Structure formats: C-alpha cells, structure tokens
Swiss-Prot record:
Similarity comment text for this entry: Belongs to the universal ribosomal protein uL15 family.
Protein name according to UniProt: Large ribosomal subunit protein uL15
InterPro entries: Ribosomal_uL15, Ribosomal_uL15/eL18, Ribosomal_uL15/eL18_sf, Ribosomal_uL15_bac-type
Function: Binds to the 23S rRNA.
C-alpha cells in the first residue's frame, strides 16, 4: 500500500552532490572517477574548448575568411568645443600637453580629435591631430586659428 510518507520524489530539483574518494563500494573511491594516470587525473586539468581527442578540430578544418582592419584603426581622444570654451582662456594654446595637464586625454591613443559639440567664442590657438567637419566650420566662423599636427 502506498502512503504519503513512503512516496519518493522521482524528479529532484537538486541532485545530491557526488561524494568521491569514499571507498570502493561507492563506485567513486580511490581514483574518484578520474581514471589512472595522465593529465586528466591531476588537479588543475581542464579540457581545452574545441578539443576533439586526436581528430582534427572543426575550427582548424574551416578556412579563414575575410579580413578585419580593426587592428590598424586609428583611435583618438575626443574633445568638444564646449569643453574648450569652459576650461581655456583667451590667447591660450590647446594642444596635447595642455589637455593632458587638465585631465582630458589618456595618452594611449593616436592623438586628439576635435568635435563640434557646442560653440567656441574664445580666441584660442588649437593644435590637434584631427578635426570633424562641423568643428572646422564653427572654428572658421569664429575666426579661431587651428592647425592639424601629425
């Protein structure tokens, strides 16, 4: 006869953890399911992703395709016109050194690019590595001298 206290949960939500190294009667004693010797028996061993046990791995069978120019792209630290307006005074020079002193650039890039966000009314001298079209238009309208350095 089946009673409520004798029912077993056939689909456990949490399986009991596998206790290894607890004697030969448990099926996971001595070598703990790792086999005898070799890398798999040692601690710290992890199978490499895509390893296929002697067979040529799939990623090596497939041909190389395409080309990515990402490793050659030029990355710039960017600064906007409104940032120059807020920090620099009339007659000052905006260059890599002055921007680094004020904490605007990190230095792990190919230079500085000036973007056209905001307006510039102060007469400053600008020496940067690249300028966007909108920034170039605003600088010529404001009659601010700028130079693109290499």
């Amino acid at each position: 006869m089946i009673t409520l206290n004798t029912l077993k949960d056939s689909t456990r939500k949490r399986k009991p953890r596998k206790r290894v190294g607890r004697g030969i009667g448990s099926k996971h004693g001595k070598t703990c399911g790792r086999g005898e010797k070799g890398a798999g028996a040692r601690s710290g061993y992890k199978r490499r992703l895509g390893k296929e046990g002697g067979q040529m791995p799939l990623f090596m069978k497939l041909p190389l395709r395409g080309f990515s120019n990402a490793q050659f792209r030029r990355q710039f630290d960017v600064i906007n016109l409104d940032q120059i307006e807020a920090v620099f005074k009339d007659g000052e020079t905006v260059d890599e050194l002055s921007l680094r002193e004020r904490g605007f650039i990190s230095g792990r890039t190919h230079g500085i690019k000036l973007l056209g966000n905001g307006d510039l009314t102060k007469k400053v001298k600008i020496h940067v590595h690249a300028i966007s079209e909108s920034a170039r238009e605003k600088l010529t309208q404001a009659k601010v001298s700028f130079e693109i350095v290499k």
